[in-house]
From Swiss-Prot:
It comes from Haemophilus influenzae (strain ATCC 51907 / DSM 11121 / KW20 / Rd). One of its GO terms (biological process) is lipopolysaccharide transport. Coiled coil: none annotated. The keyword Cytoplasm does not apply. Component of the lipopolysaccharide transport and assembly complex. The LptBFG transporter is composed of two ATP-binding proteins (LptB) and two transmembrane proteins (LptF and LptG). The chain crosses the membrane at residues 13-33, 62-82, 100-120, 276-296, 306-326, 332-352. The gene is lptG. Part of the ABC transporter complex LptBFG involved in the translocation of lipopolysaccharide (LPS) from the inner membrane to the outer membrane. Keywords: Cell inner membrane, Cell membrane, Membrane, Transmembrane, Transmembrane helix, Transport. The lineage of its organism: Bacteria, Pseudomonadati, Pseudomonadota, Gammaproteobacteria, Pasteurellales. This is Lipopolysaccharide export system permease protein LptG.
Length: 358
């Protein structure tokens, strides 16, 4: 049950988190918008489309910056309460540190639910629409992304790619060749395609050729062959969603597909488990702020708290990236690579709180 003090603490933290989040997202949006100037003028891509693209990527930024905003917002709000001795008064009135911690976590819960909702049902749609719109404008309409794949025009060829795994890997590719009278004369299908940066070319694997004659269809098969095309990884990558932009359910289904086709899933599994454990990461950030306020940051300035929060948030990011990539490289289960950073910081929180226990 939420009492008056819970609401007071929650209101203070919510306001600080919202202000911090809007600041971080706003700075990111400005940087992205400036970056788009390099593409303005290509194809039909203009300044207004750059504005739309930037706006559509804001939901992803909200999810990305939320853990940092939770840490900084909680530090600022709790720090203000501590500097006005309000936390001391609460404890004197019987509102223990544990109860204050529970009040902080109650505040985090609806925010975490909100970010998970937009991550599942908002971000994949807005990110895909943003990339599709931008790619269509930059390519002059020669690339079109649909629900089941990507269509591209390549001279007299029309290419359909079922899945763009990343910028340099494609799955289930169909290449249709037409003559000057727009008659279909060749159909090529490949299970996979990979791009070599050194040789600057695509290689198709498990290729099936169908040449359509007037009276017959001639079929041949090849294990691999070079694909001469104007479609570069940059063009195809413009319409492919990054793993971090996929929903949890989308990642789950995509991982299942990769397993069925015998492909490496470690990178996608790591992203999947990080999304699952994001509520834990947010809770850790807010409890870390609480442990600092009850400890060494009780009486310092707001600026010092912000700098400390940025440093700690960056440290968490570095530890998260190092342990995550280590799990991918050495074949450690991805669930450990996603969870261990939070567990390490929980140990740090326990140590800070126990060291400062009255």
């Amino acid at each position: 049950m939420i009492n008056t003090l819970d609401r007071y603490i929650g209101k203070s933290i919510l306001g600080a988190i919202f202000a911090t989040l809007m600041t971080l997202v706003g700075l990111s949006a400005i940087i992205k918008f400036v970056e788009q100037f390099r593409s303005v003028g290509k194809g039909t891509y203009d300044i207004w489309q750059a504005v739309i693209f930037t706006g559509l990527t804001i939901p992803k930024d909200i999810e990305t910056f939320f853990p940092m905003a939770a840490l900084l917002g909680a530090l600022i709000a709790l720090g203000n309460l501590a500097s006005r001795s309000e936390l001391v008064i609460m404890q004197s009135a019987g509102f223990s540190r544990f109860k204050i911690g529970i009040a902080v976590m109650k505040t985090a819960l609806p925010l975490v639910v909100f970010t998970m909702i937009i991550g599942e049902w908002g971000i994949p749609q807005t990110e895909q629409f943003a990339r599709d719109t931008r790619a269509k404008a930059l390519s002059g309409g020669s690339i079109l992304s649909i629900k089941n794949g990507v269509w591209a025009k390549d001279g007299h060829h029309f290419v359909f790619v079922r899945r763009v795994t990343d910028d340099t890997k494609l799955d289930d590719i169909y290449i249709y060749t037409f003559d000057q009278q727009h008659n279909l004369i060749k159909l090529k299908h490949a299970n996979q395609a990979s791009y070599s940066e050194d040789e600057a070319k695509w290689t198709l694997r498990q290729v099936n050729h169908s040449t359509i004659m007037k009276d017959e269809i001639i079929t041949t098969n090849h294990l691999s062959e070079t694909w001469e095309t104007s479609l570069t990884p940059d063009k195809l990558g413009a319409v492919s969603l990054r793993p971090t932009s996929l929903s949890i359910s989308g990642l789950y289904h995509y991982i299942s597909f990769l397993r069925e086709t015998g492909q490496d899933v470690s990178r996608f599994e790591l992203t999947f488990w990080r999304k699952i454990f994001q509520p834990v990461s947010v809770g850790v950030m807010m409890l870390l702020a609480l442990s600092f306020i009850f400890g060494s940051l009780r009486s310092v300035t707001a600026g010092a708290r912000i700098v400390t929060g940025i440093c700690v948030g960056f440290l968490f990011y570095v530890v998260n990236e190092i342990l995550g990539q280590t799990s991918v490289v050495y074949g450690i289960p991805a669930i450990f690579g996603a969870l261990i950073p939070s567990l390490l910081f929980i140990v740090m929180i326990w140590w800070l709180l126990s060291r400062k226990r009255d």
